[in-house]
């Protein structure tokens, strides 16, 4: 008889403990119900990126001196710089510059260490394609500035997300 009472007491303690855990989880769920939604309807609404966002790299051909610092500081030796030495003026002339964004890790080292500031990060992050070879941008594609999200009339921009 005594063992039956202790088993019943253990069972009731376990039931109370389980109900308390369920109640704690339910209270957390209820606290989230009063918050504003964090998700956005992506193709129709876009977040404005922060000032230091590391998106697609923009390249200015006229500023580049073909020093290849960007290649040396890149952890994966990604930028391809083709140049020709002009013997009469003893300077390099840039022929081709390309970056494959299918491989790029967007670390920003090339932008940070460029001595002439011919590289900069843009706010463009929509680089998806069906063919990975389309992600290999030459100097012409890198020179195009992306369309600003703020000026895009087809989408609604959201300035900032609600804080927790």
Curated annotation (Swiss-Prot):
Please give one Gene Ontology molecular function term for this protein.
iron ion binding
Q: Could you tell me the superkingdom of the organism this chain comes from?
A: Eukaryota
Task: List positions binding [4Fe-4S] cluster 2.
Answer: 74, 104, 107, 110
Q: What does the record give as cofactor?
A: [4Fe-4S] cluster
* Localization terms from the record: Plastid, Chloroplast thylakoid membrane
Query: Which residues are the signal sequence here?
Result: none
Give the way it sits in the membrane.
Peripheral membrane protein
Reaction(s) the record says it catalyses: a plastoquinone + NADH + (n+1) H(+)(in) = a plastoquinol + NAD(+) + n H(+)(out); a plastoquinone + NADPH + (n+1) H(+)(in) = a plastoquinol + NADP(+) + n H(+)(out)
Binding partners and assembly: NDH is composed of at least 16 different subunits, 5 of which are encoded in the nucleus.
Q: Which family does it belong to?
A: Belongs to the complex I 23 kDa subunit family.
- Its function? NDH shuttles electrons from NAD(P)H:plastoquinone, via FMN and iron-sulfur (Fe-S) centers, to quinones in the photosynthetic chain and possibly in a chloroplast respiratory chain. The immediate electron acceptor for the enzyme in this species is believed to be plastoquinone. Couples the redox reaction to proton translocation, and thus conserves the redox energy in a proton gradient.
User: Cross-referenced PANTHER family, in alphabetical order?
Assistant: NAD(P)H-QUINONE OXIDOREDUCTASE SUBUNIT I, CHLOROPLASTIC
Q: Could you identify this protein by its name?
A: NAD(P)H-quinone oxidoreductase subunit I, chloroplastic
The organism's taxonomic lineage, starting at the top: Eukaryota, Viridiplantae, Streptophyta, Embryophyta, Tracheophyta
Identify the coding gene: ndhI
């Amino acid at each position: 008889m005594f063992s039956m009472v202790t088993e019943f007491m253990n069972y009731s303690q376990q039931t109370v403990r389980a109900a308390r855990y369920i109640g704690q989880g339910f209270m957390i769920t209820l606290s989230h119900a009063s918050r504003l939604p964090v998700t956005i309807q992506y193709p129709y609404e876009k977040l404005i990126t922060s000032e230091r966002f590391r998106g697609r790299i923009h390249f200015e051909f006229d500023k580049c001196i073909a020093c290849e610092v960007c290649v040396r500081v890149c952890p994966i030796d990604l930028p391809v710089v083709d140049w020709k030495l002009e013997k009469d003026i003893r300077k390099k002339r840039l022929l081709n510059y390309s970056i494959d964004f299918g491989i790029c890790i967007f670390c920003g080292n090339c932008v940070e260490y460029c001595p002439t500031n011919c590289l900069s990060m843009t706010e463009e992050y929509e680089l998806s394609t069906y063919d990975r070879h389309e992600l290999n941008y030459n100097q012409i594609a890198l020179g195009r500035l992306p369309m600003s999200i703020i000026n895009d009339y087809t989408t609604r921009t959201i300035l900032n997300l609600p804080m927790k």
